[in-house]
């Protein structure tokens, strides 16, 4: 596989890995401590959103396989999912001071549905790029390495922002 195609496919893995640290590590603190929901309630709300996510994963997989678009049949799902997830993460990381349980739950579900709409077709697309087993392994390995670089970059950005004196909520 040409490096240009491999780079085009693996590039989004970097961008989609960037929000993982803010969402998984700082989101509970943001809502549980800074917005006074309490860590237990915040954890329960996020668990409920994840349980709903377990239902949407196979549904989105089925729909993205069944309703294929002509050329690049997975790209509309990927683009729509990225937009929905982007809106969800923006709302989650920029809550109103009076944001409560319903706000956290609804925007968490929005994020996870968007993420599923992005991730399931994106991962399936990688498997469709080659019929050769070893080439698919190479494609997946490159994608996951780029994803890890995105996670490390997110951690470095937040650490750098904190080092420069920004508070934790401003860092995320």
Residue positions per predicted region:
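Membrane-embedded alpha-helical bundles of multi-pass transporters/translocases
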Residues: 1-172
């Amino acid at each position: 596989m040409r490096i240009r195609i491999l780079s085009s496919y693996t590039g989004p893995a970097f961008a989609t890995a960037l929000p993982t640290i803010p969402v998984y590590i700082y989101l509970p603190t943001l809502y549980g401590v800074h917005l006074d929901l309490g860590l237990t309630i915040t954890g329960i709300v996020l668990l409920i959103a994840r349980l709903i996510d377990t239902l949407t994963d196979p549904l989105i997989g089925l729909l993205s396989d069944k309703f294929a678009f002509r050329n690049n049949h997975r790209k509309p799902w990927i683009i729509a999912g990225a937009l929905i997830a982007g809106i969800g993460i923006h709302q989650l990381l920029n809550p109103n001071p009076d944001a409560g349980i319903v706000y956290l739950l609804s925007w968490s579900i929005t994020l996870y549905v968007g993420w599923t709409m992005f991730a399931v077709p994106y991962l399936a697309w990688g498997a469709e790029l080659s019929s050769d087993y070893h080439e698919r392994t190479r494609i997946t390995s490159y994608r996951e390495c780029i994803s890890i670089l995105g996670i490390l970059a997110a951690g470095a950005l937040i650490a750098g922002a904190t080092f420069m004196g920004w508070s934790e909520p401003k860092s995320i």
